[in-house]
Regions:
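Active-site core of glycosidic bond-cleaving carbohydrate-active enzymes
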Residues: 30-199
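Acidic/histidine-rich catalytic neighborhood
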Residues: 1-47
């Protein structure tokens, strides 16, 4: 069987698919956990080669890597957020943790994993562009990683619209930036600013 984290949860988000009846947010082996563990083990293996660590230690890392649950494509051609196919294509939640493998990690590439690449793109299309600042900043980077500079630029343009007043009065306001160029969110989200600059 696969090695997975348990208990696990996809940050601030639980399955709300058609068949889940708002199931528990606690699951086993959500996709983001598996992606982060893949990076940790891969980096440890790389370091162990450089440091000429024992063959048995390197073999144990390889064995764990080979037993991790793989990323999976669901019935809506999306990258699954959970081991089970529980995603809802109408879910517009701002958290998109399961595309960590696309960015900031580099596990999903159009050259090595074209089907996962398309599934990650489908996930972003299903979730939409509206979100709070930190999530918008991340989406700029995700669309850039998806080789769609026009989509990333559209998000940047929306992000840099000035807020009509001096405070945020709704979840997703028309303006996303204060006059001082801080990302608009009560009080503000510096992650949005940092995400934007990383995407550029």
């Amino acid at each position: 069987g696969w090695m997975v984290t348990a208990p696990s949860m996809s940050p601030e988000h639980g399955p709300s698919g058609e068949d889940t009846k708002k199931a528990s947010t606690i699951v086993a082996g959500c996709t983001m956990d598996n992606q982060i563990i893949f990076d940790v083990l891969s980096n440890a293996l790389h370091a162990s080669r450089i440091l000429k660590m024992s063959a048995s230690y390197q073999d144990s890392l390889r064995s764990m890597l080979n037993r991790l649950a793989p990323m999976q494509i669901g019935k809506y051609n999306q990258l699954q957020e959970w081991l089970e196919d529980l995603d809802n294509p109408n879910d517009k939640h701002r958290h998109i943790s399961h595309v960590y493998g696309l960015f900031p990690s580099n596990q999903i590439s159009p050259y090595t994993h074209p089907l996962l690449f398309q599934a990650a793109k489908n996930t972003l299309l299903q979730r939409g562009d509206e979100a709070t600042g930190w999530s918008i900043g991340w989406k700029v980077n995700l669309w850039a990683r998806l080789l769609d500079g026009n989509h990333a630029f559209r998000i940047i343009n929306n992000m840099l619209k000035l807020l009509p007043g001096d405070e945020v009065k709704e979840a997703y306001p028309q303006g996303r930036t204060y006059p001082n160029l801080f990302d608009a969110h009560p009080p503000f989200q510096i992650d949005g600013n940092f995400g934007y600059t990383a995407g550029v």
